[in-house]
Amino acid sequence: MSRIRIVFAFLCQLGILPASAAPAIDPAELEAFVDGVVHTTMRQNNIVGATVAITQKDQVILLKGYGFADKEKQLPVDPESTLFRIGSVSKLFTWTGLMQLREQGKLDLDTDVNEYLTTLTVPDTFPEPVTLRHLMSHSGGFEDRIVQLFGDEVADMQPYAEILSRELPDRVRAPGTVSTYSNHGVGLAGLVLEEVSGEKWGDYVQQHILDPLQMSSATAFQPVPEELAGQLSQGYAFELGKHVEKPFEYVPLGAAGGMSASALAMTRFARAHLGDGSVDGQRILSGESVALMREPLFDEHESINTWLYGFDNYSRGDTFIYGHSGGTLRFFTEFVLIPEYDISMFVSTNTTMGFRVIGAVLRGVLDRYLPDPMENVEPLPLTDLDKIAGHWSTYRHPVTTPDKIIRALQPVVVQPVSDNELMVAGLAEHPTYWRQVAPLEFKRVDENVSLVFQPDASPPRMLVGSVLRSYYKISWIESTNAQVQLLIVSLLMVLWVLLAWPVQWFKRRPSRLHATHGRAQLAGWLMAVAVMVVVGLSATLDDSMVFGLGTPAKVLLLVTYLVPLLVLVQLVTVARLYGSDVGRGIKFFHSLLVLIGLYLSWLLYYWNFYGPYPW
């Protein structure tokens, strides 16, 4: 979004210039349309409950609940009072609070955050300090961290300083170089808010944002206060053909995702940000701060949406759209603002896979009332394939800890499918197709989204739609495909050793084996046992890691140390085999087993299974 357009929008909100002609939205027709979309997608995806609010020009034109807040008790969703967990939409309240403190002259966005912290110090890994500007744009340079991101009991709700002193992710890149989502970075910003204001984050949000806006059916506290507990929706997963009610998900770093709110409450927060920072005479921000939060804060390329002051940029064509998404394991939320037409949308669901409902509603409403026609651009022949084809990884993953393994679950592959079209697998649930429209720039064939390659960056980078969706190129051996293929071959041989060697041992009897050969077989068999134990325990890892590591995972991390130790023993015994008179075939097989053991040991090292463990 250009700076001129930002100024124009700001003048419109002050009444100095007329706003653009708003799309004609008939509330009854809108309700019928949204009803159809929600009912269909809820049924298709087994969603228990959803809530929707749409406003235009300070008027609520759609406020509706769908399904149940509590299926067992048959309590319907009430859009005025039912609280949904809004996940990362909570971050907007953190940024709003920090902008309030900035207005009061209590902090500056370009000051080293260590200047505001008394309970911990951000390491000086790089010469450039981390600032609030970096944290607001997710460019602080921290690796991602998922273990213990959530909690399953109130005891997990510890002071921010304690959590971050123990779990602050490593700084793995210079600040301001890459925008990659960081919950812990926002938690750090929440700690700055606490230290500067002298109030706990939840108390601050309640007193300085929720109360002034009269958001009575919203809270920043966990667990939800007793007076609101009866209004909280349950969270659900669809497992083995039925809905399963799940416990309350605590978010220890609440500033990054711990709030709960009704659809009606969120319309008041929307009005404050769509207007001049006030609602019904109660001001939470100045008009200048509201306008500033719509400005670009992190920019990469003219065809790629920027990141704003705490907000994501969802702009389509010439229409400036911004907001934020949120998600826990069970709840999914989207909060969207369109200042040019004074429109807001809030959609939230209470069941796993609810993001499909949200996507259908938002796309449907935008396509219906603010269409974004496909640009008719003549595709160019593919060029620089050697620089763009291959394997890519998201920047958003752990780097130094064992939960780095989640990167293997997010493989992205770029490959040509014709003279002017690329297929990219891994960006969405299904492969997407792109046509080149400029050097190193592509447009999706079915949507106005840009993809840009930056092959001269170090490492080469790919941007998809938004600066926050950035990827870097990886080598073949680092790719999920290569590692899975090599792992399967290795495990087949290990499994053969595990099952066949004991049979051979008893069939031939130890006394008839060459002594050195027998020791080599025993060492190889023990290594095979350790490898299969690691594989078996790895299979127990799932999304419950976000609550912390269970006993199987902790045992796994201990057993992994046995693999390289037993490989070393195997290496010594094989070296002795070469000084004996055993056959070449036996020597070759044991040597191959050592190589496989070394590869598996390297693989465990590559994925940080040998530590460090900050948990």
Language model segments and positions:
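Active-site SXXK
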Residues: D35-V38, D58, R85-D110, V186-E194, ...
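Short, well-ordered beta-strand elements
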Residues: H324, E334-N350, R461-G465
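Short, surface-exposed loop or secondary-structure junction motifs
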Residues: Y66-D70, D124-P339, V365
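Short, conserved catalytic-motif segment at the N-terminal edge
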Residues: I25-F84, K106-D108, E115, P123, ...
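Peripheral terminal and inter-domain segments
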Residues: A22, A360-W615
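Solvent-exposed, non-membrane alpha-helical residues enriched in polar/charged side chains
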Residues: D35, H39-R43, M99, N114, ...
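Sec/Tat signal peptide C-region and signal peptidase I cleavage site
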Residues: L17-A21
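Bacterial N-terminal signal peptides
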Residues: R5-I16
